[in-house]
Amino acid sequence: MSVPAKLGFVDKVRAHLELLDPVTWISVFPCLAAGVMASGAMKGTVHDYLLLLAMFLMFGPLGTGFSQSVNDCFDLELDRVNEPTRPIPSGRLSPKEGLANSIISLLLAIGLGVFTGLHVGGVRGMIIMASIMFALFVAYIYSAPPLKLKKNILTSAPAVGFSYGFAPFISANALFGDVRPEALWLASLNFFMAIALIILNDFKSAEGDKDGGLKSLTVMIGARNTFLVSFTIIDLVFAVLAWLSYTWGFMIPTFFVLLGLVLSMVIQVQLLLDPKGGISFMNSAVKDGFGNVLGKSDVHEHNAFLRYQIANNALFLVNNLIVAGMVGFKYL
């Protein structure tokens, strides 16, 4: 890919934003929203909305952005194969500029986390600060040697589950109220759902992972078995959510969670029968309606995952928010 010898200011800014991978920022918001709803303590004031915005900036553009930026810094050679159009391998940003991007994002995330934690105060404030600090630390060792957690799915998937699922949920829950057992249960389910989805997301880089010695599940056991492992985790998450909803006395939400489980399993069967072309009727949704958000891929299994992700995320998101809202309502 040919790149001008010197990019203009606007193009440099665009390259820095692309390095932070804005399409990934929104991934933490459902967990933040559910965490806040489960607290039942947020008030419709400007103050509380600003706190929620600070939490989103901390885990979204800054925290998630840092994880994407630092990953590109350490994976330059791998990205030349898997994603050669990214800012650093394409030459739009130098490795030093990429490093500066990640350092600035890290410092801003830490600063905002400390400020928010001190503002909230007490044990809740400590939970917020500890969550963002540990999430940032995990994001670093995910990509950086010598640990480089992403080298093996057994360490990379839990790292993603914590940073994208558990930590945002717990932090948002602590923002306005005490962290209760119900919140810990729901945060744990978000942790496992994130694990299940990141397993499937590795389809897009299977060839590069194999050449680079990374042990993704797809490389180790193949596409069909990877689908089977991920679907088992997803179905267990739905089943446990239904059980929790029932034991907490939420009868109507229990029905909707079970309905979501059944619908998800119907789609899963089609993908297991045809890992490359299953649920092809949703192709237009990926290419047109959601293509810019979810991304596109030349790998058939990854495109199948993108189609499934639309349906699964909608089913889990709605049920997760409903149950979290009922928990919060119980403590009003």
Task: Go through each PLM region and give its residues.
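Multi-pass alpha-helical membrane architecture of UbiA-family
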Residues: M1-L332
